[in-house]
Regions:
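Active-site-adjacent loop/helix surface patches within enzyme catalytic domains
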Residues: 2-139
Length: 142
């Protein structure tokens, strides 16, 4: 399993775990509220107390950062409800989704409608194509 050659910045997060042999067949795209940089995302994910991470992030300038290698599971979609039960989407826990997915955080505006600028969109499209090609993902659903 390889990582994207499109990466401009790397800061590996301690917030990760094994994919347990699960094949990558999804990509998760999240928006970081505020025009974040790849460095600020790296600083945030470097804090073990945050308990969150992403495989990649795209800063407001369009640069791409890597925080968790694709061979590892980023802690992006997991979580528990107020009773400590795993949050589920269509019956699948966030941890199970994270094991199947490569996650990407994208810089956006701080206020609704949380617009993503053209530099971020262009980098996102290139990164998605690269991830899909390397992992044999034929079709993405939005």
């Amino acid at each position: 399993m390889s990582n994207s050659s499109l990466v401009n910045y790397t800061r590996i997060s301690p917030n990760k775990s094994s994919r347990n042999g699960t094949k990558i067949d999804m990509v998760i795209i999240h928006c970081v509220v505020g025009q974040a940089s790849v460095e600020s995302l790296g600083s945030r994910f470097a804090q073990s107390s945050v308990g969150a991470s992403s495989n990649y992030g795209i800063g407001a300038d369009g640069r791409i950062g890597m925080y968790v290698e694709e061979k590892d599971r980023a802690w992006c979609s997991g979580g528990v409800d107020r009773y400590g039960n795993p949050i589920r989407v269509n019956g699948i826990s966030g941890a199970d989704i994270d094991r199947r997915a490569v996650s990407i955080e994208c810089a956006c505006d701080a206020y609704a409608p949380y617009k993503i600028n053209d530099k971020v969109y262009k980098s996102l499209i290139k990164l998605l194509a690269d991830i899909c090609k390397r992992n044999g993902i034929i079709r993405l659903k939005w």
